[in-house]
Amino acid sequence: MRKASLLLLVPLLAACSSTLDAGQQYDGGDANYVMWDESERQDPVSASGTTFEGDDINLEDLRGDVVIINTWYAACPPCRAEAADLNAIAEDYAGDVTVIGVNVRDNAATAQAFERSFATPYESIDGTDGSFIADLEGTVPLQAVPTTLILDAEGRPAARYIGQINPEIVRGMIDDTL
């Protein structure tokens, strides 16, 4: 019986591990965030999508800028809780950083109501078909919302924060990426 229990535990523990956490922890042992040294960064990522307003956004067109990508949806409690912090970051770093939201679940009316309610100063891509996040596979967990990804000026993943952000930590990551 004990051997059978152990055999059941092995796949469960293996499922909890992830190669997404490769890289250097930015500060402390919090596994929710990671920042990669410049020499360890992956190749530039390529993804594109259309905002709820009908504008096309292509990450390749943003090379030369530091880009912050944040996945969210309107009914997500941590997404709502971090909205003011992301707005402040977008405003404080305007001109140095491009912030893009990726709504992974809502229809246009719901997403736009959220953006109006929180006075979001940046556009969000309609990511409900999953293709934008799928293009970031290996960098952003497909089901982890919210996730915030910071790309360096070359378009390479520099840092990632899974869950509701701590704005001081994310600001430090941005400063180190700039």
For every predicted segment, state its role.
Residues 57-80, 86, 99:
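Short active-site neighborhood of thiol/selenol oxidoreductases, capturing the structured segment around
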Residues 37-67:
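A short beta-strand-turn-helix
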Residues 71-73, 102-105, 127-128, 164:
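Active-site-proximal beta-strand/loop segments in catalytic clefts of secreted hydrolases
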Residues 33, 57, 133-136:
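N-terminal post-signal-peptidase region of extra-cytosolic proteins
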